[in-house]
Amino acid sequence: MSMKFTYQITGLTRRIDILNLKSIYIRQSPLPSPQHHFQVLGRNLPKEAHVCLPFFFLLNVLELLLIGATIGRVTADVLPDLVLLEMFDYYLLQSQEEADDYPLDVEAWHTLVHVCQRWRAVVFRSPNRLNLRLFFTNGTPVRETLDIWPPLPIIIWQSGNETWGLDNIIEALEHNDRVCEINLLDVQSPHLEEALETMQQPFPALTELGIRWQDDDTDEIDETAPIVPDSFLGGSAPRLRHLDFDSVPFPGLPRLLLSATHLVHLYIWKIPHSGYFSPEAMVDCLSTLTKLEVLWLGFESPIPRLYQENRLPHPIRCVLPLLTYFKFKGNSKYLESLLAPIDAPLLDSLEIMFFYKVIIDTPQLVQFVSRTPNIKAPVEAHVVFSDESVSVTLPGALPGRLLLEILCRPSEWQILSLAQVCSSSFPQFLVPAVERLYVSDTVDLQPDWEDDIENDQWLEALRPFTAVRDLYLSREFVPRIASTLQELAEESVTEVFPSLQNIFLEEFHLSGTVQEAVGQFVAARQLVNQPITVFHWDSQREEEFEDDDLPVIGDSSVLDDSSVLDDSSVLDNSSVLDD
């Protein structure tokens, strides 16, 4: 039976179910604002004005009590400790969700303990329930702070490369038995070296750890970051749940992870050569991380040939039963060795970034994706070219995201890579199922990007998309793809895009050469009884329309100067969409 109690507030009796606060009712709609509660609590109400409050009224009451210790005949003393604790808990939860700055949510309990001695006692009797913690930065006087508060868990946060106050961080780290969270962000040498030296002892209470090293020139690969020694954290992290290393070399990381069996989030990014560890060592530690939900593993640059020897398959299967998000950046050979023994039955987001290779051979990646239960045939695909890479995203293949990106600059390399990944790096049932294909670029694409690309290379890259009905071309790619379509018209018009029905062009005012090229392709498809309709595509307004709602201007093939195509001798009866 749930425990109930009754307490009096200015003549208004409320009955609250402590063990089921969601069952509290209010016979008044809409819910009064906190300002209204302030007025109500200051005067008597008729007995028939029974008001039963939803859960967050507790927060409103607490806010009123924080405004003043007494309001009329209402004081904090009328509330039992259990009710105060419920309100404190909810108040701190709301503070955590609404705080704009990280320390504010950690230190919200300071407000409560300064109201009165009774509130202070209630708060400090339940430090675990209220998740009380002390927050230290380089500007926090550690000794004075520790002297005035109970022995609560410690959070250490250092952001930036300020030289002042480093002694405070080091002094806080020396309380290793109480430190529950450490974030050292954008810290340069030798300050990071000094902090790492202090962290060689065990931190038994540590649940979150983030270290990001900041070099002097972020555009250049730098191998001067201090190497984390094998004795880091005493070689054990039994309570660690969140680990984030960015640009920090730690070759002994897999050994530490063997003890971190409660790990939920693992982010290891921008690994320099000095921090390399083998895929086999990574598989060994991953096999113990059965609670892992998010895994990021990324290398700063291609792995030297020294580490690219052929490897035997890992003898033990590794199942990550809770993993939902995997992101990788590195060599394709490394990923192949890593994924071969791994299964992730709940995976719903997969992002892969490869450094360029002439031949990209990824059979293990194909098998890994194929045995992922959440995988399904996508409806659309996005091919995006940038100054540094080409990527293919299949939004509907997984509940989250499926992305494969090749990191390279020359446009010819990008086209060759696109052809390879679309034909061999995805399971065979994915790319051929795509019905809507978007080809676009980013703002940093160089103007001379396509100078060395032949039409045959474009045809090879687009050939796997056999089911595409709708082709969307961004402004920059309209002229680039147009000549390829023109070549199709002169040879085998259905060799590529045999199912194509609609072309959406973001560029509205086409040059005569581009109009002729697209027009020849449209006319050639008309001759084989596979008509193509050309539309203007406003990518900014795309979300405002469903496919069936896109406006089309009649069947006239000859429009004014604002039309996408205006050559009646080429277009025949194809429809054109106006702006």
Which sequence ranges carry the predicted segments?
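Leucine-rich repeat
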Residues: M1-D579
